[in-house]
From Swiss-Prot:
It comes from Arabidopsis thaliana (Mouse-ear cress). Induction: By dark-induced senescence. Down-regulated by infection with an avirulent strain of the bacterial pathogen Pseudomonase syringae pv. tomato DC3000. Keywords: Disulfide bond, Glycoprotein, Hydrolase, Plant defense, Protease, Signal, Thiol protease. Its EC number is 3.4.22.-. One of its GO terms (molecular function) is cysteine-type endopeptidase activity. The keyword Nucleotide-binding does not apply. InterPro entries: Papain-like_cys_pep_sf (IPR038765), Pept_his_AS (IPR025660), Peptidase_C1A (IPR013128), Peptidase_C1A_C (IPR000668), Propeptide_C1A (IPR012599). Disulfide bonds join C116-C165, C148-C191, C182-C236, C183-C187, C213-C240, C222-C227. Thiol protease that plays a central role in plant programmed cell death (PCD). In addition to its role in protein degradation, may cleave and/or degrade a number of target proteins, activating signaling towards PCD. Contributes to the increase of caspase-3-like activity after UV-C-induced PCD and is required for abiotic stress-induced PCD. Functions redundantly with CATHB2 and CATHB3 in basal defense and distinct forms of plant programmed cell death (PCD). Participates in the establishment of basal resistance against the bacterial pathogen Pseudomonase syringae pv. tomato DC3000. It holds the Pfam family Peptidase_C1. This is Cathepsin B-like protease 1. The gene is CATHB1.
Amino acid sequence: MADSCCIRLHLLASVFLLLFSSFNLQGIAAENLSKQKLTSLILQNEIVKEVNENPNAGWKAAFNDRFANATVAEFKRLLGVIQTPKTAYLGVPIVRHDLSLKLPKEFDARTAWSHCTSIRRILVGYILNNVLLWSTITLWFWFLLGHCGSCWAFGAVESLSDRFCIKYNLNVSLSANDVIACCGLLCGFGCNGGFPMGAWLYFKYHGVVTQECDPYFDNTGCSHPGCEPTYPTPKCERKCVSRNQLWGESKHYGVGAYRINPDPQDIMAEVYKNGPVEVAFTVYEDFAHYKSGVYKYITGTKIGGHAVKLIGWGTSDDGEDYWLLANQWNRSWGDDGYFKIRRGTNECGIEQSVVAGLPSEKNVFKGITTSDDLLVSSV
C-alpha cells in the first residue's frame, strides 16, 4: 500500500513538474538570443580586458582552452538547469540548522574527508581520431562541444557519491546516465535539461546504479551524450554492462530530498555536517572566462542555468567571502577545474537553489563494489 502510494505521488509529481516547466526547456535563464549572438564565439577579448582592468572585479579572466572556438550556442547547450517554479517545491522540506553550531572560517571537503577520492576526482578528456577518450571520471565532465545539458544530473550524483563515502566510508561513483535516461519527467527532459531536485527525488524512490554498472562509454569508443551534435537522451536500458552486477543490486538510495534554507550559515552547516551539496545558478558570458579569484558578475549576456557541486568556503586575501565549487569543465577551465564565487550576496542566485539528500544504507552492505574499476583518480 505504501509503495503504491509513493508511485502515485511520483507520477503526480512528474506531471506537475511537466506542466509548470514546459514553457522553458533551456535553463534558469533561457534568454532568446539572436542568431548572430548564438553563432559568435563565447570567448571575447573585450570581456577579458573589461574584467582584468576593473580594480574591483576580484577575479581574473582568460581564454580558457576548454572553450577554444566554441560558439555561444555550443556553450549554452551545456547549461542544463531548467527553471523550476516555486510551486513545484510544494511538499519538499526546507532544512535549517542550529545557528549556534560553530563553523570554521574556512572549509574544504577535499581535506576534511581526504579518504573520499570522489570529492576530488577530476576528468581529463582527449581527442584521438575524432573520438573522445576518458582518462578519469570527474567533478562531472565537459562534453567537448557536445550537446547534452545534463549538469543537473552530474551535480546530484557526484554530491551523493561523496555523501556515501562520508557516511559509510564507501568510495563509489554513481551513474549520471541512469538518472538522465531513466528518471523521466520527474527530472525533466534528459539531455534537454532537468531539475536538480528531481534527481534527488529519483534517488529516494528508485535509487541510482554505479558508474561501473551504467557508464558513459563502451568498448567501441565514445557512446555517451555529447559525442555527436544534438545527441538525444540515452535510452533507459535497466541492465548493467558489467556481467558481475545486477541492476537492482547496484542501486544506491537516498533518504529524503530537501532544499537548504538560502542563508549562508545554513548552507555552510549542511556541507560541514553532511558533505557537498548541489547548487544551481545563472551563468553569464563572463563566467566562461573565469581563471582565478572570487567570481562575481561583471559583464556579458545572460546565457542559461548551470548546476555544480559546492564543497567549501573561505575568505580571500582581499577580505571577500566566497564559496568553493567544483565545475564540470575539466582541469583546463578555471582554477584547475574549480572556482570561487562571492558568498553572502546570493551572487547569480547561487544561494537560493541548494538541494541535497542523505544516503541510505540499503544495498550498501551486500558485497557490491566499493570502487569502480573503470575509474582512475586524478588528484
